[in-house]
Amino acid sequence: MPLKPKLLVFSHICSPQYVTGAEKVLMFMLRELQPYFTCTLVVPTEGVIAQQARAYNIPVICHDVPLVVPLYLALPHLMGEIESLQRTEAWPALIELIRREQPDVALVNTTVHPLPAIAAKMLGVPVIWSVMEAIRFTPHTANSAALIEHCADLVVGISEATLAPLRTPGLLPKSIIIPPSWNPDALHPESWPELRAIRRADLGVADHQKLVGYISASIFDAKGLDHFMQMAVEVSERFPDALFLIVGNPTDPAYFEQCLERARSRDLMGKFRWIRFEENVETIYPAMDITVIPSIEAEGFGMTALEAMVFGRPVVLYGAGGLAEIAGATGNSAYMARPGDTGGLFARVWSLLGDPARMAAAGAHNASAVQAAFGIDVYRRRIVHLVGLLAGRGVLPPSPVKGTGDTVYRFENGLLRPYRTGEALQADGFSYEQVREVSDLLIAMLPKGEPIGSLPPPKRGRRSRTAGRRRVLARARRKRGRRRPIRGIAAGRRRARRIGARHRRPRHPRRGRKTKR
């Protein structure tokens, strides 16, 4: 079988201690693309996702590529900064990397990482641009969109919010949405009750107490920790059994201390717990009773909201960007407050804490609704659609595919069209050596189109052989004077008796001869 197309994936960061939402989404997509591509990950330095990639048998290249933040911020000096970086040693080194690796496709992650896309475009390599955050709306947003339009053969957004600044006539036809998902096999739900008990014991949370959680890989002002603290202080003064958990790494220590001061000034620090980073989220979410996501700026998606719902937690959030889309898709609009409305956060959290039955029902609803909206089966159908688009646009070579069975198919407009015969495959310009083997899951999930080629001539089956045998016997009978063959011993005896009955005459005793007595 020929090799799968090579996909060179550029990650803008590789955090040494914790995984950001963008890194998590990228790694999940990379694993789901492995059935269709030979993937190689390019990271700026060693870190967590580099280790994860190697564990999944994905080669890793450490190669630092400068970021271009003005693309995301839509600043006027965007092109000037790119031209300045192209005059540094980093630019020819990037060109040489892509030339050496010779990928069939390049995937660029986030809107602060344009240099790999520009370099790949120059070398004639098709580009998939994964957009995980919403570009800022400024007078120069059109310049950012124009750069992406020029470089990208396909733009993959994780939400409507991420694609909103890119809804131009040139980008609309080549933009799709693939929201994040999760691998249910990696979460081990049977262990959640035990993990809940262990983690709550470690945090000093009793069974009768309610733990309200805030989680963000990086804590800075846009993530709204100060709004969470204001809500938490008000809740704790009215609900003595409420405790609060903060999970995340402060990237702005001054801001973090300012947030904690809200509780410290009221002598409420004993009600708060803090975990800087936890890679195994399955040990965190089960311990929470409610999860709050108070992002004050538009989120590209909102992985914490998704994860909390997967674990069956009630979620209270601000309707900022992708968070509003998650709330709408899962029927959680009642628990969505207007961004900046801390009173709205308080009212929703308070209503859940005061009604245990309602809190349990909200969690159960989330576990079911998030599966229907963002589950792994939905995600894989979208990946199949992505692969079909790439093949249809000529980004991928349209080589035929097969599963473990014998049927060979051709990708065409998101459909699998089976070849009726090997001659049909050859007439389409392919040999059997060009057929790629893919997972049976892909074959089962893709809708099937019209077969290719003419129906093969009918085969001579057992019935034809029987008819031939009868013709031979008939000829033999004609040669023997049309005598019918004797079928078996008993049949022969019966037939002999019938023949004898026709030809034998009755025997009479001879005259003059006496019978002895």
Enumerate the language-model features and the residues they cover:
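A short helix/loop element that forms part of the nucleotide-sugar donor recognition site in Leloir-type
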Residues: 188-205
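Short hydrophobic beta-strand element within catalytic cores of glycosyltransferases
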Residues: 314-317
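Conserved acidic donor-binding segment of nucleotide-sugar-dependent glycosyltransferases
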Residues: 329-330, 334-342, 351-356
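A short, well-ordered alpha-helix in the C-terminal region of glycosyltransferases
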Residues: 201, 358-373, 379
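A conserved mid-protein helix/loop that constitutes part of the nucleotide-sugar donor-binding site
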Residues: 20-28, 210, 219-234, 257, ...
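Nucleotide-activated donor-binding/catalytic signature segment of Leloir-type glycosyltransferases, i.e.
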Residues: 248, 257-277
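Short, surface-exposed polybasic-aromatic patches that bind anionic ligands, especially phosphate groups
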Residues: 395-468
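Glycosyltransferase donor-sugar binding loop
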Residues: 42-48, 182, 215-216, 243-258
